[in-house]
């Protein structure tokens, strides 16, 4: 996620920091991250990923964090967590560990779910912060929703005594990579590349941002399946299609079996939509009929591989 990367960049303005590399955020990646730290490391920023309850608890037992940050409780990995309530319980395992071990949590004061989760653990030390601290702070992350990630990084930086100007400079200098919240200009089109991961919450936010922007040459949304949604998959993919088509998209490309099934169930009644079972099929279509002068969104789960389309855009 973008928040851990921003936090590490901000803290690196004052401390020797080692942070999670790539997607090493599971029961294998977290130990590898810890082993890569040296005696000179002053602060470690460890991303913890999970797709089911119990996984964050395991990672906390491995990493033994002193501080914790949950940016939100979204509709991710619903199949493994068994619904949003399971996501809340699973992420709450970080607060459980911190409360039991004298740790401190950074909590966004305007997020009622997170505030309630923290309050439920009465002995948890909490550092509340206001997302308004990010107002007017320049950054290169695509999407207004990334203001929340900027605010989280600023709150952590302030707590650890990083100079305010250096915090702002670090945020402004951070260039997103790994296909997260990036805007790119190619020889033919302008792209918003956000296909490192996708879940219903992030899909909704990305589409809202994309549809809200002005475009001279027309908008093309290329959406890849959101994986690990289980029984919620059909409804969530349908909701994403409806959101996209309610906006000013010129074309909507749907890549993957889940989106294809959702569209067929909807009756296939819009000529703007094109279906592709795989990313390779979409790439072949792009090679045959390339876009030019378009504003293009690439949003989907990493497993779909939408990043492979970039060379043809």
Short names for language-model regions:
Residues 178-180, 303, 307-308:
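ATP-dependent carboxylate/acyl-activation modules
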Residues 177, 195-271:
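Active-site beta-alpha connecting loops in nucleotide-dependent enzymes
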Residues 67-190, 217, 242-251, 260-272:
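Acidic, Mg2+-coordinating active-site environments of NTP-dependent enzymes
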Residues 37-40, 160, 213-217, 288-294:
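Glycine-rich phosphate-binding loop signature in dinucleotide/nucleotide-binding domains
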Residues 273-282:
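Short acidic-hydrophobic, aromatic-tinged amphipathic segments that line or gate anion-handling sites
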Residues 1-105, 109, 116-121, 157, ...:
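Phosphate-binding loop of NTP-binding sites
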Residues 43, 67, 152, 291-300:
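Short SAM/SAH-binding signature in class I
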Residues 61, 282-290:
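Short amphipathic alpha-helix with an adjacent loop that forms part of the alpha/beta core around
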């Amino acid at each position: 996620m973008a928040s851990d990367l921003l936090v590490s960049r901000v803290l690196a303005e004052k401390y020797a920091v080692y942070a999670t590399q790539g997607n090493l955020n599971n029961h294998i990646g977290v130990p590898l991250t810890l082993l890569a730290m040296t005696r000179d490391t002053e602060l470690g920023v460890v991303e913890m990923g999970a797709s089911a309850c119990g996984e964050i608890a395991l990672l906390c037992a491995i990493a033994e964090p002193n501080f914790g940050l949950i940016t939100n409780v979204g509709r991710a990995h619903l199949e493994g967590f068994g619904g949003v309530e399971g996501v809340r319980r699973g992420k709450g395992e970080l607060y459980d560990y911190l409360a039991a071990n004298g740790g401190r949590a950074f909590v966004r004061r305007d997020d009622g779910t997170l505030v309630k989760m923290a309050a439920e653990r009465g002995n948890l030390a909490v550092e509340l912060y206001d997302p308004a601290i990010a107002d007017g702070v320049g950054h290169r992350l695509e999407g207004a929703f990334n203001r929340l990630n900027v605010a989280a990084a600023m709150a952590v930086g302030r707590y650890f005594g990083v100079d305010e100007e250096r915090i702002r400079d670090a945020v402004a200098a951070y260039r997103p990579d790994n296909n997260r919240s990036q805007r790119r200009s190619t020889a033919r089109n302008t792209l918003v590349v956000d296909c490192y991961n996708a879940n219903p919450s992030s899909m909704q936010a990305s589409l809202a941002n994309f549809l809200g922007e002005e475009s001279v040459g027309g908008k093309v949304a290329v959406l890849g399946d959101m994986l690990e949604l289980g029984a919620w998959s059909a409804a969530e993919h349908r909701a994403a299609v409806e959101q996209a088509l309610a906006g000013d998209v010129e074309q909507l490309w749907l890549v993957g079996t889940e989106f294809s099934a959702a569209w067929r169930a909807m009756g296939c009644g819009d000529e703007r939509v094109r279906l592709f079972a795989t990313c390779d099929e979409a790439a072949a279509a792009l090679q045959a009929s390339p876009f030019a002068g378009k504003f293009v969104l690439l949003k989907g789960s990493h497993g779909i591989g939408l990043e492979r389309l970039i060379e043809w855009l």
